């Protein structure tokens, strides 16, 4: 057996353990929230896995509308910013337990027709390798005002 093959076989399990040992912190989730408030889709996506899933709070399915993979999720987030040019998620609080997390927030935004929205909501996260694998969003449904 070649020395390089033996070295690989000996250290590959250690490499796998190191990769799966990445922990998400509250600072990481705050950085994610800051990227949303900056409407910085590139920064947002850097927090998510390549095979990420975004389950929107509204849509035709029981779990809202589901977007899978970096491209679909990126387009979904860009669409939110187009609908709500002043979208903001404030008063964020983050909670983490193992590979799951929760962020509570107050969403405010104004649609292009002048409709104002202010609702509480939360994101339920599943983490993988130190990034967000699933972002499942929930928010209150409230009468809107102009």
Where are these regions (language model features)?
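Short, surface-exposed coil-to-beta transition loops
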Residues: 88-89, 104, 117-123
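Short beta-strand edge/turn micro-motifs at domain boundaries
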Residues: 120-143
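A short hydrophobic beta-strand element
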Residues: 98-107
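Bacterial Sec-dependent N-terminal signal peptides
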Residues: 1-21
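Residue-level signal for well-ordered, solvent-exposed loop/turn and beta-edge residues enriched
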Residues: 53, 115, 131-133
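Short, low-complexity N-terminal intrinsically disordered segments enriched in polar/charged residues
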Residues: 16-46, 70
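A solvent-exposed, acidic/Ser-Thr-rich amphipathic alpha-helical stretch
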Residues: 46-92
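Short, cysteine-centered beta-strand-loop-beta hairpins and adjacent loop/turn segments enriched
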Residues: 83, 108-118
């Amino acid at each position: 057996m070649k020395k390089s093959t033996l070295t690989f076989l000996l250290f590959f399990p250690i490499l796998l353990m190191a990769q799966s040992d990445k922990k998400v912190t509250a600072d990481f989730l705050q950085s994610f929230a800051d990227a949303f408030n900056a409407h910085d889709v590139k920064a947002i996506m850097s927090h998510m896995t390549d095979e990420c899933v975004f389950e929107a709070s509204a849509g035709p399915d029981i779990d809202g509308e589901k977007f899978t993979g970096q491209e679909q999720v990126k387009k979904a987030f860009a669409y939110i910013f187009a609908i709500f040019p002043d979208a903001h998620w404030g008063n964020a609080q983050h909670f983490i337990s193992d590979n799951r997390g929760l962020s509570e927030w107050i969403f405010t935004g104004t649609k292009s027709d002048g409709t104002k929205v202010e609702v509480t909501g939360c994101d339920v996260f599943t983490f993988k390798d130190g990034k967000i694998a699933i972002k499942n969003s929930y928010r209150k449904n409230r009468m809107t005002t102009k």
